[in-house]
């Protein structure tokens, strides 16, 4: 069972834009092999940063308007928002430690 909630077009503003604090969104699709590779890392980070970082997943096939709005050209894309403002995005599979370092830098700003 996943600890990571799904965000959709209809919940995007409430879950991401109006959220206080750091939010990490995993843009993915069911057919995407690299998305399946990074998914366990996203789950682990959700547990490790519980209460500090809101971790969400967005299915790009079902919510293509959000993916288009933020110009997501490749998946997986991990996007970071803080207090409703986009901070950064990472495209592709990256090591867990890289993501932890990125999260820590955003939490300490």
Which functions belong to the PLM regions below?
Residues 20-22, 37-58:
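Conserved helix-turn-beta segment immediately C-terminal to the redox Cys motif
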């Amino acid at each position: 069972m996943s600890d990571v909630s799904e965000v959709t077009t209809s919940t995007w503003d409430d879950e991401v834009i109006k959220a206080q604090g750091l939010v990490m969104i995993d843009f993915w699709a069911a057919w995407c092999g690299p998305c399946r590779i990074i998914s366990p890392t996203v789950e682990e980070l959700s547990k490790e940063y519980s209460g500090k970082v809101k971790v969400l997943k967005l299915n790009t096939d079902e919510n293509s308007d959000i993916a288009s709005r933020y110009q997501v050209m490749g998946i997986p894309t991990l996007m970071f928002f803080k207090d409703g403002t986009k901070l950064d995005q990472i495209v592709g599979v990256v090591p867990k430690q890289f993501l932890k370092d990125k999260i820590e830098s955003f939490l300490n700003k």
